[in-house]
Structures are given as C-alpha cells and as structure tokens.
C-alpha cells in the first residue's frame, strides 16, 4: 500500500495533481482544502495517501494531514459511500461542519452536497456518529477545515477564473446550471480561481 508520497509537484488542476517521486509521476485526487495548501508547481511537497484498487483502475487519493485521510477512510466504510462521494463530502464542508451535521442530525445540510440523497444522509448520520466522535476527540486542537469544490464546463462568456471554478464544481457532481449560477453570483473583479471556488461552494451550502 502507498501511504505517503514525497516529491515535486508537477501539475495541479483541482481536484487532481501530479507528483514526481524519483522520476515516477503519481496522479492523485485531493479534497479542496488539501489542494489549496499545496505549494506552487515545481516545488517539493509531501502528501498522505489512500490507495484504491478497482477492476478497471488503480486510484490514489491524497491528503495534507493524516486526520483528513482518517476521516476519508471512515467515510468510505459507510454504506453507500465510495471514494468519489467521500472526496466530495470532504471538499464540501469543514471537518467541524460535518461533525456538527452528525451531532445535530442535520439531513438538510448534507443533502445539499452533490450525490448525497436523503437515504445516504440518514445512513451517514447513524453510522458516523460514534466513529466521528472518536476521531475528533483524538485530534482536538488540530482540526483542519475542508472546502468544497466541483467541476463544470465553462460558460461561453466567463473569464479564466470563472472557467476554472465552474470546471471544479462540475468535477464534484454539481449540474452545469447550478455551477454557472453560483460562480456568476460569487464572482468579484480580481478574484482568482481558488478564491472564487471557495465562495461559490460556500453559497450553495
């Protein structure tokens, strides 16, 4: 199992990155908060990883901290939650917000995330309550927040920052009209793509 990578960041296009480790390029997918903490391209970086083997693919998921990876691993053990949905959840709300949803039985907030229906949200609330409590107690004081991102194909009259933001929202499962509307409403002159993605995602939760 590949548990950690240390190398040079070659490419990054949310939520995917490419890291060169001694001449071998590793492709990873990351939740947005981890993605935003990466250095600039061609700089050294270290990420913790979770390796998934499927019949049709071998996938690596990357995280800046072990805590993020632990939460991801708890999520994919829940019924109806695979790696893709777990990544979307971790990209869509902070760790404290997710714990808060579980503690409050807040189905309304959870179902706003793409791919999370009512039944899935109900299962998460039941299955994650005790598991999350243990995880958060083990990491008091070191809690990191997660940000939501998705991918969407660009609308014809948007600038590059808006195109990147829409594309990111689409990758998380938002519909093109949702992504376009959220990005357009959140955009302010001079915003870079990362700031715009965060603002657009926040407006949809």
UniProtKB/Swiss-Prot annotation:
GO cellular component: cytoplasm; Holliday junction helicase complex; Holliday junction resolvase complex
Region (Flexible linker): 144-156
UniProt xrefs under Pfam families: HHH_5 (PF14520), RuvA_C (PF07499), RuvA_N (PF01330)
Record region (Domain III): 157-205
GO-annotated molecular function: ATP binding; four-way junction DNA binding; four-way junction helicase activity
GO annotation (BP), single: DNA repair
Superkingdom classification of source: Bacteria
Region described as Domain I: 1-64
Localisation per UniProt entry: Cytoplasm
Keywords: Cytoplasm, DNA damage, DNA recombination, DNA repair, DNA-binding
InterPro entries assigned: DNA_helicase_Holl-junc_RuvA_I, Hlx-hairpin-Hlx_DNA-bd_motif, NA-bd_OB-fold, RuvA, RuvA_2-like, RuvA_C, RuvA_C_sf
CDD domains according to UniProt: UBA_RuvA_C (cd14332)
Renumbered residue ranges of the record's region Domain II: 65-143
Signal sequence residues: none
Comment block on domains: Has three domains with a flexible linker between the domains II and III and assumes an 'L' shape. Domain III is highly mobile and contacts RuvB.
Family statement drawn from the similarity comment of this UniProt entry: Belongs to the RuvA family.
Purpose of the protein: The RuvA-RuvB-RuvC complex processes Holliday junction (HJ) DNA during genetic recombination and DNA repair, while the RuvA-RuvB complex plays an important role in the rescue of blocked DNA replication forks via replication fork reversal (RFR). RuvA specifically binds to HJ cruciform DNA, conferring on it an open structure. The RuvB hexamer acts as an ATP-dependent pump, pulling dsDNA into and through the RuvAB complex. HJ branch migration allows RuvC to scan DNA until it finds its consensus sequence, where it cleaves and resolves the cruciform DNA.
Summary of subunit composition and partner proteins: Homotetramer. Forms an RuvA(8)-RuvB(12)-Holliday junction (HJ) complex. HJ DNA is sandwiched between 2 RuvA tetramers; dsDNA enters through RuvA and exits via RuvB. An RuvB hexamer assembles on each DNA strand where it exits the tetramer. Each RuvB hexamer is contacted by two RuvA subunits (via domain III) on 2 adjacent RuvB subunits; this complex drives branch migration. In the full resolvosome a probable DNA-RuvA(4)-RuvB(12)-RuvC(2) complex forms which resolves the HJ.
UniProt cross-references to HAMAP family, sorted A to Z: DNA_HJ_migration_RuvA
Protein name, entry field: Holliday junction branch migration complex subunit RuvA
Organism for this UniProt entry: Shewanella sp. (strain MR-4)
Protein's gene: ruvA
């Amino acid at each position: 199992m590949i548990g950690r990578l240390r190398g040079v960041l070659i490419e990054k296009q949310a939520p995917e990155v490419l890291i060169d480790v001694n001449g071998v390029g590793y492709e990873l997918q990351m939740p947005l908060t981890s993605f935003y903490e990466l250095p600039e391209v061609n700089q050294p970086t270290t990420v913790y990883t979770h390796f998934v083997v499927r019949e049709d693919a071998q996938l690596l998921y990357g995280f800046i901290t072990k805590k993020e990876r632990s939460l991801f691993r708890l999520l994919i053990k829940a019924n109806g939650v695979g790696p893709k949905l777990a990544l979307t959840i971790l990209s869509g709300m902070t760790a404290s917000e997710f714990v808060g949803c579980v503690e409050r039985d807040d189905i309304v907030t959870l179902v706003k995330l793409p791919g999370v229906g009512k039944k899935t949200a109900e299962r998460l609330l039941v299955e994650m309550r005790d598991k999350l409590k243990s995880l958060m107690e083990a990491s008091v004081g070191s809690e990191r927040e997660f940000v939501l991102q998705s991918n969407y194909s660009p609308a014809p009259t948007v600038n590059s920052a808006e195109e990147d933001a829409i594309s990111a929202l689409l990758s998380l499962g938002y519909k093109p009209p949702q992504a376009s509307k959220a990005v357009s409403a959140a955009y302010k002159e001079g915003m870079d793509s990362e700031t715009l993605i965060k603002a657009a995602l926040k407006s949809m939760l």
